[in-house]
Amino acid sequence: MTYQQVLDFLFNALPMFQRVGGAAYKKDLHNTIALCRALGDPQKGFRSVHVAGTNGKGSTSHMLASVLMEAGCRTGLYTSPHLRDFRERIRINGQMVPEEKVIEFTMRNRELFREIEPSFFEMTVGLAFEYFREEQVDIAIIETGMGGRLDSTNIITPELSLITNIGWDHTAFLGNTLPEIAREKAGIIKAGVPVVISETQPETEEVFRKKAAEMQADIYFADQLYDISVRSFTADAPHADYLLQDPGKGLQVLQSPLTGQYQLQNIRGVYAALVQLRRLGWQISDEALERGIRKVKSNTGLRGRWEILQQHPLVIVDTGHNKNGISYILQQLATVPRRQLHMVIGMVNDKDVSGILEMLPKDALYYFTQASVPRALDAGTLAEQAAGFGLRGRVIPSVPAALEEALQQADASDLIFVGGSTFVAAEVL
């Protein structure tokens, strides 16, 4: 089989949440445990950091990996979903897993897949863990797919756990209140393994403290330990300078190409995690920290976080796709000088569409679109729902065509935003 034939088999034969939604969700870890047992329990063959949270876990995971790379560690990175290439999910020192490994793993385990019937995500976890063990990584950063307690990645015993924050997303599976969702995320807290929480939230702090106490795990709330601010920030700048105050070390200036205001919490959480890794014996210098934050994009291939595609007109794309993520984006869009705001927007059909639409600015020009995945909400349906919130514009089902139309309509001093869904963002990157 060719690489493309293997991908076709994996995408079509295994349930994939990113494509079909809840039909791919498994309510226990049985399949993952069975699959990894058949593979020789590769998760026991490398050390790791486990990252969960509603928003920011992707940026956090990439920053941690970048810093550890700069510290000289052979570093694995497992994230999801991918934007353009399936292999983005599995990297070592920034390099994607080779096509040959994906082909070999799939061909060798086809009968096992038929027997166990793993989801697409469970399969990718098995592939990543086997690859990290084979390549003898020093450490791997493992990002959860959804939740924590029942997430397929939750068969590892990491050096450290990190939870970014809690917001409303995947409520059909994780719960309808922040404490309920927090309990699911807190499921990654392991016995005796320290845990960092990037952002203190009144509704969830006690949930995390209780779980950590039950597991006899030390817990650290990053925003209760370290102050962080941005020295200078303009939304169309290629980088920002963050000022991080550690009471034990003084002021540190960290330059990052991740310029969203929401990165303040992520960088602080990353710093708190690195402090704990140092206490565990990992050699991570201040220079490695500075270089890792500054080179996160080039080191790890991270894309789609407040990414500027062009100037005049300014085009910005972001993968934020739930109420919390969209809220951060809107706050930042409001700081950008422009004549007119154009919004190229598409969503998936299992999100709180109304909750997001009611937040969007009514003075923007809209281009309602849909990504090329089965979960995508029909562009016409989205436009109809948006009209109920006073949002009006054109229906252009093709994402690239919608962006092209916005570019034709926009003046050089206008701002075009593309997003609403990870999959919409992926089609213009």
Can you describe what each PLM-predicted range is?
Residues P118, A140-E143, P158-V253, Y271-E290:
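Acidic, Mg2+-coordinating active-site environments of NTP-dependent enzymes
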Residues Y78, P194-E199, M343-I345, A364-S372:
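Short internal beta-strands
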Residues L64, R149-E159, V428-L429:
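Short Gly/Thr/Asp-enriched flexible loops that form oxyanion-binding sites at enzyme active sites
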Residues G21-L29, A34-K44, E70-I156, A172-L174:
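ATP-dependent carboxylate-amine ligase catalytic core
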Residues M1-G53, T60-H62, S66-A71:
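Short functional linear segments
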Residues Q201-K211, Q216-Y220, L314-V317, K323, ...:
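C-terminal helical cap/extension that packs against the catalytic core
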Residues S421:
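Active-site-proximal loop/hinge segments that shape catalytic or ion-binding/gating pockets
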Residues G45, E134, I139-T144, S152-L162, ...:
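Nucleotide phosphate-binding/pyrophosphate-handling subdomain across enzymes
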